[in-house]
Amino acid sequence: MAAAASNGNGMEVDVAALPSVMAQGVTGSVTVALHPLVILNISDHWIRMRSQEGRPMQVIGALIGKQEGRNIEVMNSFELLSQINDEKITINKEYYYTKEEQFKQVFKDMEFLGWYTTGGTPDPSDIHVHKQVCEIIESPLFLKLNPMTKHTDLPVSVYESVIDIVNGEATMLLAELSYTLATEEAERIGVDHVARMTATGSGENSTVAEHLIAQHSAIKMLHSRVRLILEYVRAAEGGEVPFNHEILREASALCHCLPVLSTDKFKTDFYDQCNDVGLMSYLGTITKTCNTMNQFVNKFNILYDRQGIGRRMRGLFF
């Protein structure tokens, strides 16, 4: 019985019936460094499409980065438009060229390196799309992410195309490349929240988010209780409700239970923090004052130039 798998468009594909597109015994010609931001972008793209369509969908996008000789660094990505004609995917090249102009304005030192998609093992439909990308760039990379896998390993594979003789004909095949993960300082900070996902299987909240939610709930409850006590004390002082000495004693005991720090270290840290906050406020005020002064000088220069022109014009008649 032949195995069946989804091709990412909601259709079942007979895997055994598809011809193999993988090259055997071929060593990669380049080294690839992959940034986590690319994986996050692809995952976000796939999740959004699944939410919009209500079922898993295959997504396609472009890879950008830097290349120096045989070393390729995939640093970012963006989405591509595509359509299905006769069960074959066709890339919207006009959309790509528009996006290319836009990303070159922002990322001037990056170039188009290849494309990505989602799904399982590469099949002939991937070769069909890869040939279209080859019309844009020579020897593009091909990255495929499998979002449905249950393995703990990173479900990402990177390929390059090779030409081999199959049944006497030149055929484009894919050779898998090994890759390493490369991160920058800003990127590590950005993905730290995602990296701290809990192992409960829900994947909805991270450990940091759960801790902050618990703290927020506790502080919210404390605030409501303190506000209730304060309202009672004010009402008792105003004669709206009778004095309950037991409640007042408990409120007084609660106030005396609050920690009072008077150590030298606390005073030093407190004054340092106050100085930092005051300095930030002072710098903000100075910046605002400089901006106001700059606007005043500009308006003064405009007015002075106009008066100078008026005096010169009057001098022509006397």
Curated annotation (Swiss-Prot):
Gene3D superfamilies: Cytidine Deaminase, domain 2
Primary site of residence: cytoplasm
Subcellular location: Cytoplasm; Nucleus
Domain of life assignment: Eukaryota
GO terms of molecular function: metallopeptidase activity
Keyword Disulfide bond listed: no
Record Pfam families: JAB, MitMem_reg
Residue spans crossing the bilayer: none
Protein's GO biological process: protein deneddylation
InterPro entries xref list: EIF3F/CSN6-like_C, JAMM/MPN+_dom, MPN, MPN_CSN6
Keywords from the UniProt entry: Cytoplasm, Nucleus, Signalosome
Entry keyword Thylakoid: no
Residues forming coiled coils: none
Cellular component, GO annotation: COP9 signalosome; cytoplasm
SMART domains: JAB_MPN (SM00232)
Every MPN domain range: 32-165
Subunit structure, as described in the record: Component of the CSN complex, probably composed of cops1, cops2, cops3, cops4, cops5, cops6, cops7, cops8 and cops9.
Entry-linked PANTHER family: COP9 SIGNALOSOME COMPLEX SUBUNIT 6, EUKARYOTIC TRANSLATION INITIATION FACTOR 3 SUBUNIT F-RELATED
Role according to the record: Component of the COP9 signalosome complex (CSN), a complex involved in various cellular and developmental processes. The CSN complex is an essential regulator of the ubiquitin (Ubl) conjugation pathway by mediating the deneddylation of the cullin subunits of E3 ligase complexes, leading to modify the Ubl ligase activity.
Family: Belongs to the peptidase M67A family. CSN6 subfamily.
Name listed for the protein in its UniProt record: COP9 signalosome complex subunit 6
The organism's taxonomic lineage, starting at the top: Eukaryota, Metazoa, Chordata, Craniata, Vertebrata
